[in-house]
Design a protein with these regions (language model features):
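N-terminal cap/lid segment of alpha/beta-hydrolase-fold proteins
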Residues: 1-17
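Conserved HGGG/HGGXW glycine-rich cap/lid loop of the alpha/beta-hydrolase fold
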Residues: 14-79, 93
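Active-site acidic short loop of glycosyltransferases
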Residues: 27-29, 95-101, 123
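Flexible, active-site-proximal loop/turn residues at the rims of small-molecule/cofactor binding pockets
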Residues: 48, 77, 108, 135-136, ...
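Active-site loop/oxyanion-hole signature of alpha/beta-hydrolase fold enzymes
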Residues: 62-109, 113
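Conserved hydrolase catalytic core segment
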Residues: 100-144
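Flexible "cap/lid" loop of the alpha/beta hydrolase fold
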Residues: 127-168
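Alpha/beta-hydrolase
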Residues: 161-190
C-alpha cells in the first residue's frame, strides 16, 4: 500500500509508547478500532482487513497493546499487564488520536478487553462492538485448557504449569511444550 494511505506512529502512555497504524486515515465513515488477541499478540494479523478500509471509506485503527509488538515493553514492570492498564491505554489511544466515535472489534483476548472496556468504563462514542473468537468465561477457558494438558507428556505439562505459576515464559522447556500444545490443540505448527 502507498504511504499516503497509511499513518502510523506512537502515542505516549505511562512513560511508554503505544504503536498504532491507521489504514485510510482520511476515510469519511466512523473508524474501526481493533483490539488484538493475546495478551501478547500484535496488530499484524489484521492486515487482511486493510482493503475493507477503502471499500467502506472507513479508517481502520490497529494498535499494539503495551508490552506487545512495536509498543514499549514494560518488563520488568509486569505489574502493568492487567485489564486496568489496557483499558486506560485504549482510552488514551482514543484521546490522543481524536477518536470520539468508533466501532470496536476485539479478537480473542481483545474481545475480552472490548467487553471489559464497555462494561467497566461505559465509554461514550462506541457505536458498535464486534467480537471474534472471544471466550465467554475466563475461568471455564482456564479449566478447559488445563484439561488439555492431561494429553501432553508429563514433562511438557510440568513446564507449562511451572511457567504459568512463576509468570516466567522464557525457558526453552516452556517454548517447546507450548509449541507442541499449539500444534495439537490450536492450529497446527507455527
Amino acid at each position: 500500500m502507498e504511504n499516503n494511505v497509511i499513518k502510523d506512529g506512537f502515542v505516549s502512555f505511562l512513560g511508554y509508547k503505544t504503536y498504532y497504524r491507521i489504514v485510510n486515515p482520511c476515510g469519511k465513515k466512523v473508524p474501526l478500532v481493533i483490539c488484538h488477541g493475546g495478551p501478547g499478540s500484535t496488530h499484524n494479523s489484521y492486515e487482511v482487513l486493510d482493503d475493507m478500509a477503502f471499500k467502506e471509506d472507513r479508517p481502520i485503527v490497529r494498535y499494539d497493546q503495551l508490552g506487545c509488538g512495536l509498543s514499549s515493553l514494560s518488563s520488568p514492570h509486569t505489574y502493568l499487564w492487567n485489564k486496568e492498564t489496557w483499558m486506560d491505554e485504549l482510552n488514551n489511544l482514543r484521546e490522543k488520536l481524536g477518536l470520539k466515535k468508533i466501532h470496536l472489534r476485539g479478537h480473542s483476548w481483545g474481545g475480552r478487553l472490548a467487553l471489559l472496556y464497555l462494561l467497566d468504563r461505559k465509554p461514550d462514542g462506541v457505536l458498535s462492538v464486534t467480537l471474534s473468537s472471544t471466550l465467554s468465561s475466563a475461568s471455564l477457558w482456564k479449566e478447559e485448557t488445563h484439561h488439555l494438558l492431561s494429553y501432553l507428556p508429563s514433562y511438557e505439562k510440568e513446564a507449562l504449569l511451572k511457567a504459568e505459576e512463576a509468570m516466567d515464559f522464557s525457558s526453552l522447556e516452556y517454548h517447546n511444550a507450548y509449541e507442541h500444545y499449539y500444534h495439537l490443540f490450536i492450529g497446527g505448527p507455527f
